[in-house]
């Protein structure tokens, strides 16, 4: 009897967490995580808890990410050498990319994610090419 109650409570908690993540998806992730520059030169910094700055020093850069999502209050900004510069962002983790915040760049920003990319109703992408 006691085990049954524990299972019921655990199931109810799991269902509640799942429902919350479906209703409020923008609040279950943070700025892109685990960025590693594998080609070209770029510096990744977080000037604040809701801002990420990527300063790209070469025409082309490739960055591998564990996850690449941007929540509603968050912003990711790429500063590139010029409008023809390209940053290829490869997501190597298992989660889809959820863009509910702002992604800006003066050049091209490409995001490749085998799990998919969703731009939500509050998502803003302002780049030269995407």
Question: How should these model regions be labeled?
Answer:
Residues 3-6, 20, 25-130:
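Solvent-exposed adhesion/ligand-recognition segments of exported proteins
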Residues 2-14:
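Bacterial N-terminal signal peptides that target proteins for export
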């Amino acid at each position: 009897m006691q085990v049954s109650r524990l299972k019921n409570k655990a199931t109810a908690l799991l269902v509640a967490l799942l429902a919350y993540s479906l209703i409020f998806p923008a609040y279950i992730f943070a700025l892109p995580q685990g960025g590693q520059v594998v080609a070209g030169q770029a510096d990744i910094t977080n000037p604040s808890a809701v801002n990420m700055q990527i300063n790209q020093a070469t025409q082309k850069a490739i960055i591998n990410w564990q996850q690449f999502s941007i929540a509603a209050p968050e912003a990711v900004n790429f500063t590139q050498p010029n409008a023809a510069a390209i940053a290829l962002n490869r997501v190597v983790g298992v989660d889809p990319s959820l863009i509910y915040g702002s992604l800006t760049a003066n050049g091209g920003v490409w995001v490749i994610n085998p799990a998919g990319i969703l731009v939500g109703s509050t998502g803003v992408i302002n780049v030269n090419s995407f």
